[in-house]
Amino acid sequence: MDFKENSIYINVMDKIYAREKEVLSQNQDFQENNLSRISLILNYEDFSLKFDESLHGYSFGYVTNPFGLKLHSPFTETVRFDGAEKYIYMKRILGVPSNETQLCNYQHQNFEEKDSQKELLPSPQQLTPPTSLPSLPLLPLPQAPEQNEEQQLTQPPSPPSIPPPPPQKKQIQIFITPSGIVSQKIQNFFRDTQIKSTDPVNCSLDHSIKKNYSLEEIYENNKNYMDKNNNFLHFLFTFIDKITIKDLDHFEKEINRVHNIKKLINQQNMKGETPLHSLIINNSESCLKKLVIAKINHMGIFDYSKCDNLNKNLLAHAIEKGDIDVIRLVLIGGCPLKMSPRSKLFKKNFKIYRQQIYRVFEIKEFLTKIGFNQYIPMFLEFEFKNININYLIESFKFKLNINEDEILLWKLLTEPYKNLDFKSFCSEYQIKHQNDLISETMANHFINVCQLNPHFGYIDFHTQIGSAGNASVFEGTYKGIPIACKEMPVSGTYEQSVDSIKEIAAVGQIKKLGCATVVETIGVLKYNQKLFLVMVKEKCNLLSFLCNKSEILKMQREGIWTSIFKISKDILKGLVSLREAGMYHRDFKTANFLVSNTGKILISDFGTSRDENEKRLNTFAKTIGTMWYRCPRLGDCSEDEKTLTHYNEKSEIYSLGIILWELVCVAMTGTYISPKIPLFQNEVDFLIWIHKDYRFSFPVGTPQSFVKLITRMCLPFRDRRPTVRQVLDNVKAIKKEFLSNRGIEGEQTYSGLECWREFNFSKQNVTRISISNLHNTEYKVVNKYDYASYNNKNSLLMKRYLDNSNFVVELINPNGLFRFKSFFEKEKLLYLKLKSTYKDEYYFDMSQFLTTIIQIHQITVIYYKMLQKYRELRLLRNNNNINKNKNNNNNNNNNNNNNNNINNNNTFNNSTNNNSNDNINIPYDFNNNNNNNNNSCNNSKKFKSISESTSALGLEASSSSSSSS
């Protein structure tokens, strides 16, 4: 070896050792976890340096053992060599092709040409490769302190044809410590110790089998190479490679010759890993993994119940690797399942096959019970091809020779999640059968639900899609049908267990009548000490449907009022069906109605439902239902009015009135408006406020028929509310009214004509406008582009946007300076909407609002009158005295103008009072402000002047409208 080649060789070795020391010095955990299994006492020639091509054009060095197997250590994958170094080293020093496969084949050819007689290890002076023949690369040998390492490496090679015999039959071995430094004490210890060892060539497994060496002899010769925790099979299965082991029949023969093979295959190291654990965990070839596991299964010598220190068995590691064939073989061997369907392991890897994995255990149990263990692989093949086992029963009936009783037993075993009966459930959860808790009728309804599906197959549910009260709802599939599994809180308190029975019994009571307006129930599933109510999964709930803008646009294209009428009729028909079944739902809201794929509205969530004949009347407390949909007088009466504390049919009419109000607001505004009142954060404040006979406001233009119906449904005293049948008849009558007035042109006397035209703002002859009941609202000039501050709930903002090819103006409440010049557009109809907001959300129930259609010059009048009122109320910030004087002069002029406008508008107000609502579109008279304020929600004197300015503004707008028309 010339000086240039020797320098490259030394450079490569220096890189390897330097990188190894750097990695080990920085990461102590890496040293303990990865080097503990390969800290071996190795012969000098037992390692060779090889190269691998990387994806980025670099070459990585790695070290091989006597079998030609790759040893993974910190420096094997981090040392990079440039192209010149690799080419010179592979071509000139090794003298063999750079391809790894060709290199190994070349080595095996040399192995067969050598003598089969075992050779002793030569001296260190003989280890340098000859220049003429190809040889394996060598690691630098650490020398004794009196000998320089660099001089050792630069010694000229000795010709291989005349090998001088060693002075003593001693083997020179090195010990690679975790820090990568050779221990001098161990080296001196083995210098005078003669250990039996085979030649590196003869240590190859293929060569050993060919020379009739047994694995037991190989293990005895190589046990010093392994650490004390791993046996030979750990070592073999960890570094198994496709090149060295090609015929596992020889492998099986040699395993049979080992007397303690069963002990070795089940031996665990410090990490609790068996040799099969090492086989699956390490990056060995998948085909070899399958062959080795198949041979071990055939021999039946491995205990699959063994787990490592992390409590993971072979199945858990196989799932982490994601190899379906390895999982199948592990299951055939009898590996138990120690994970739930919703475990992190299943969520991370292998979601598709978890259902089959669970079914495999039931199939194995059944086949073992009837004595057909040999058919387990056949059925597993079908299971892992996504074929349901139920379809195979008839096909294999004759082959397995089983009768009908055994087939029934098969179904019970392969479908383990069977329905439970009432008695077993009550006895398990210690529920007493008392008349005041669970009646016989309720028990019968419970049993009927359990018998809806006699035998459940495996239900795959893993994703939580929502919650209903204290219960979680999961999404899953059953026989190809999307389902929703509601977890029943049976493992909690005694009351929760009883409530679960009552909910299931309520479903059975409704199911008995065949109500088509209730979500379809499949049955009851008991799984993992939990109870699940299995239902068909629908599209979404009604709340999500109304909040979805795309769905609203779709309804507008098809006719939004037609959709609203259909939804209202489905909801009312559902309530009628509950009344026929003698049930009270007690929690009606949009979130508890489901929208099916066909657009039908179905009732769901019977967690608070009760039978009308239930004797425990104290269950009808004021806490039932959702706060914003709850009857206001419920549970808030004196003891003399005990009958009002009971829940009845009229109590649910109030909740339906709120739902109809939500639907009407969607039809009128095109957006969903929540009935939630954010000012009241607790239940007590809500009850105090709701007892003031508060009525929700309606957008202007709402049909009077709907206004009157919803107002009657939401009356504080329930005796005055209509029945369900009356509400259904009224909705049908309103629909006829809609169909008869929708096509009439030019009719201006009908209130809400534009509403019936479904946002078709094409009319040019708008006769009047009115601004009413803007109480508790300060007028403030705001900026169109400033949306940062939403803290002041009483300020206003005018914003323009385009809706159905019509310009729309909104008054909302961010602070700032408003620019009005962009609104001067002629012959365009604008939609003016006054809103009061709170925390970036719109609520119509904060005050009275206005919705009307006006022309563009009317907006300018309103705008300039606003500015005049600002100056009157001194809301504009003026720092100079001159500006204050100007404002005072302007205020005097404005007061005179306002008085004139009021006097001129008295006749207009008298003519329009007959056609207006009690709460909507009532023009204000400046002289009658006190009377109007008494009818409002707030009688505070704080906003008296503001209310007067609001009324005056309404009169001015009305006068401008009448003059312009």
UniProtKB/Swiss-Prot annotation:
One of its GO terms (molecular function) is protein serine kinase activity. GO terms for biological process: signal transduction. ATP binds at I465, G466, S467, A468, G469, N470, A471, S472, V473, K486. The chain crosses the membrane at residues 653-673. Its EC number is 2.7.11.1. Keywords: ANK repeat, ATP-binding, Glycoprotein, Kinase, Membrane, Nucleotide-binding, Repeat, Serine/threonine-protein kinase, Transferase, Transmembrane, Transmembrane helix. InterPro entries: Ankyrin_rpt-contain_sf (IPR036770), Kinase-like_dom_sf (IPR011009), Prot_kinase_dom (IPR000719), Ser/Thr_kinase_AS (IPR008271), Ser/Thr_Kinases-Pseudokinases (IPR051681). ANK repeats lie at residues 271-301, 310-339. The keyword ATP-binding applies. Glycans are attached at N760, N765, N905, N909, N910, N914, N934, N938. Residues 156-168 have a biased composition (Pro residues). Residues 459-739 form the Protein kinase domain. CDD domains: PKc. It catalyses: L-seryl-[protein] + ATP = O-phospho-L-seryl-[protein] + ADP + H(+); L-threonyl-[protein] + ATP = O-phospho-L-threonyl-[protein] + ADP + H(+). One of its GO terms (cellular component) is membrane. The keyword Membrane applies. This is Probable serine/threonine-protein kinase DDB_G0291516. The active site is at D587 (proton acceptor). It is found in: Membrane. Residues 119-136, 144-155, 881-940 have a biased composition (Low complexity). It is a single-pass membrane protein. Residues 114-170, 881-942 are annotated as: Disordered.
